[in-house]
Amino acid sequence: MHTTNYYNTFIEISDDCPVFESEIPKERGGNKTVALLQFEMIAHNPYQFTSDEVLFNIHALRKDLPPNEENKQEFFSKGQACFRASPLGKRYGWGIHFDENGKMALYNLDSPEYQNLKADPNLKHVKAMRNKKL
């Protein structure tokens, strides 16, 4: 089974992120976007979920599937995009921190916590994927 989990890692916003302060994703067409669902699940429950748990639970919700082990195995039988590809770091300006257990929390781009995590030499640092190819 493939995994998207990170440990002791900080995902910084992408180099071409279009915002200078973090934004909360909005609904589109009366429906919650993947970005909004990710934001709500992580921001309202910091350090409660791993990347795999967030991605699978949102997949199950959007596909109206029971979040059972069988569906989880099927979902992760194919590689899934990790949180570097999330619109939270690419478009909305949120840093994503993973602790030693792989549990994640969001940090506002203009917060002191974001700057502290960005400068922390004890963490692995990666950037969210760029929005456009060079």
Task: Give the location of each predicted region.
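Long, contiguous N-terminal structural blocks used for assembly/anchoring
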Residues: M1-D52
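Surface-exposed polar/charged interaction patches
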Residues: I13-D16, L61, K78, D120
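Amphipathic protein-protein interaction modules
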Residues: L55-Y114
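A recognition module on extended beta-rich or small alphabeta surfaces enriched in W/G with H and D/E
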Residues: A119-L134
